[in-house]
Amino acid sequence: MDNLIIGGTEVKSRLFIGTGKYSSNSIIPRILKKSKSQVITIALRRVDITSKEENMLNYINKDCILLPNTSGARNAEEAIRLARIARAAGCGNWIKIEVISDNKYLLPDNYETIKATEVLAKEGFIVLPYMNPDLMDTKRLVNAGAAAVMPLGAPIGTNRGIATKEMIRIIIDEIATPIVVDAGIGKPSQAAEAMEMGADAVLVNTAIASAGNPVLMAEAFGLAVESGRKAFLAKLGQEKLMAEASSPLTGFLR
């Protein structure tokens, strides 16, 4: 069985979906249905979790796993506070840690992220930290209690693909904890590439939300992730420098 287990929970779809940038929350149910996604992120700073009117949570199937994120947190203390607010509001124990103090490139602060992860993991949260891909920091996050790690492929919202692929390859090779490639994936082919590399899942938001037909694009990403995973399990053929004929070059009829 090819199961993805995070924090003791089986995750059936390896495509995680973000909820930012959609023109209307009403499109979210169709996005989830077509993508077959089970894990969906919500930014606490963008959602009034106490409101009953036009609440994003009303559009999310109860079977989905909510992954609130701490977007807007500039340090560990702010991330910890947001995580506690999310759990108190009924959003569950899953939390995506985002600590960003860089306002230009929006790159995560690994040091503060590690601190927040350690505190929240001890409090019983299922912590998925968003991070700059660095092997030693990944090991520190795992030791701090991360249930999965989320290295960035490229800066948030850029659709530039997996610019950090060599660093992510190293992490995949060295870390047994689930790896979810997050940020920068702009095409279904790039999501498939991440899965072919051996990533356990990918998180996509901008590429779907900014598409001409977001619902169709969500379906395309779902298929790409499934295909990429199957390719990884099938074991890709080895690349070679020299040509190698697929048919014999001797013994032709004369």
From Swiss-Prot:
UniProt pathway: Cofactor biosynthesis; thiamine diphosphate biosynthesis
Compartments it resides in: Cytoplasm
MF GO annotations: thiazole synthase activity
Signal peptide: none
Keyword terms: Cytoplasm, Schiff base, Thiamine biosynthesis, Transferase
EC number assigned by the record: 2.8.1.10
Binding-site list for 1-deoxy-D-xylulose 5-phosphate: 157, 183-184, 205-206
Alphabetized Gene3D superfamilies for the sequence: Aldolase class I (3.20.20.70)
GO cellular component: cytoplasm
Active site: 96
Biological process annotations from GO: thiamine diphosphate biosynthetic process
Top-rank lineage group of the source organism: Bacteria
InterPro entries: Aldolase_TIM, Thiazole_synthase_ThiG, ThiG
Chief place where the protein resides: cytoplasm
Reaction equation(s) it catalyzes: [ThiS sulfur-carrier protein]-C-terminal-Gly-aminoethanethioate + 2-iminoacetate + 1-deoxy-D-xylulose 5-phosphate = [ThiS sulfur-carrier protein]-C-terminal Gly-Gly + 2-[(2R,5Z)-2-carboxy-4-methylthiazol-5(2H)-ylidene]ethyl phosphate + 2 H2O + H(+)
Subunit structure, interactors included: Homotetramer. Forms heterodimers with either ThiH or ThiS.
UniProt cross-references to PANTHER family, sorted A to Z: THIAZOLE SYNTHASE
Job of this protein: Catalyzes the rearrangement of 1-deoxy-D-xylulose 5-phosphate (DXP) to produce the thiazole phosphate moiety of thiamine. Sulfur is provided by the thiocarboxylate moiety of the carrier protein ThiS. In vitro, sulfur can be provided by H(2)S.
Family assignment from sequence similarity: Belongs to the ThiG family.
Name of this protein: Thiazole synthase
